[in-house]
Design a protein with these regions (language model features):
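A shared catalytic/ligand-binding motif for oxyanion handling
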Residues: 1-167
Length: 167
């Protein structure tokens, strides 16, 4: 199984679109998780071309406020989808591998860039992780550190929640 998590910072640039389509074919990707897509909806033609024509199932989380949206897709030749859950800061797919029946979770996150929302983001993530018993792949743009100058104060503010969630 191969996949990619990418903060694409918008999909309006044809070079980014072509890069992702080519990458999907070249690396034979089974999932694609994008943040900051800048899109509230996507046509079927757009999505089919984005994954290089493969048979993908997609979920679009539209932009809201400063959050610029998410897009999560899986290859239906590789996986069966059980359920899709959308939180304020995540999209979760419950997946079953077609080849061996193994069940697991694929979670794409896009954390709040504003410090005032960090607590909400980490709390939601902690609740998500605590309630699940299946193995999980969790990735995306956590926005925990936004530059070298803020590193010391931001980690101090959030490290308790973040690191307790991981343990």
């Amino acid at each position: 199984m191969k996949g990619v998590f990418w903060n694409c910072n918008g999909l309006g640039d044809p070079k980014k679109f072509k890069f992702l389509s080519d990458l999907t074919l070249e690396k034979n990707l089974d999932f694609i998780a994008l943040s900051e897509t800048g899109r509230g909806e996507c046509t079927q033609v757009f999505l089919k071309n984005l994954c290089g024509g493969k048979d993908f199932l997609w979920h679009v989380k539209p932009p809201r406020g400063r959050s610029r949206g998410m897009l999560l897709g899986i290859n239906l030749l590789t996986f069966d989808i059980g359920e899709i859950e959308e939180g304020e800061f995540f999209v979760k797919f419950k997946i079953r591998n077609k080849d061996d029946g193994f069940q697991w979770l694929l979670v794409s996150v896009y954390g709040a860039a504003q410090p005032s929302f960090k607590e909400s983001f980490l709390t939601e993530l902690a609740h998500l992780c605590a309630k699940e018993s299946l193995p999980m792949i969790l990735g995306g743009d956590f926005n925990i550190i936004r530059g070298q100058g803020r590193k010391a104060t931001l980690i101090t503010m959030t490290d308790g929640h973040f690191f307790s969630m991981l343990s």
